[in-house]
Amino acid sequence: GLVSTMASGLKSQFGTMGKPFNAGIAASNAVKAAKLSELNFISNPDGLGSSQGFIETHSPNTHLSVYNRSTRLPFRFDKVNYKLHACCHGLHAAIEALNIAKTEKYLSPQGVRAINITVSSSWRGVCDIEKPQTGLQGKFSYHYIAALVICGFNTAALDSFFDEMLANIEINNQMRKITVSFNENMEDSYSSVIVHSEGLSEKNFEFDLKKNQKAIDAYPRLKDKAESLLDKEKTKTLYSLLSDKDNCSAQAIGSWIRAF
């Protein structure tokens, strides 16, 4: 298993330590490549787009004309999406829809009778672990994250995905109420959540990460996530640096990181 994930990124690793390990290898290799480049280590400068290069090797049907070094177009991120929950990206639209249902008083633990979550077929076999056995598997389970939201746990907090949480009786009771459906015509950024609650009419809650991202007030939620991962004092120092945009430097942020 470790050999396979060190050689490539595999969906079979989802729900195990192999997945973040693979991402860590990629980050480590990026740093190593930058350091080697600084030392004038020589490689094919067009290794990405040349004949038999990275793009052609991994996607033989790709039109290499899209990758044209002579145009000198800059490579940039066209947007930044924030990961506000400590779990697989495929669960995020469902969590946002469930949060809306929670706000509208549809998700009391005693009142929920059944919830059906419908998502794109692209998430089948990725984050649809029905009965997670570990906290890591919970990060890839619609059943588990729905139960967390119903029970009022913070989906941005690491301790919501500790192994001992799988023994929580109330979480297990709520997981039994969840069903998951897949629709091949749905965008992978979209989720539909139909809630059946006692004394309330059936209601469908929807969320599309592409279309509704601006509706999310990211700043306080990112701060909440930072506090859950670090601590309030460290987060306070970081945010005081970031709030002074005119004087905030990479060096200052680097010093903050080294202080850990």
What are these regions (language model features)?
Residues 1-10, 74:
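Conserved catalytic cysteine-centered active-site region
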Residues 15-28, 35-260:
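Terminal-appendage/accessory-domain detector
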Residues 5-8, 32, 96:
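Generic structural signal for well-ordered, non-membrane alpha-helices
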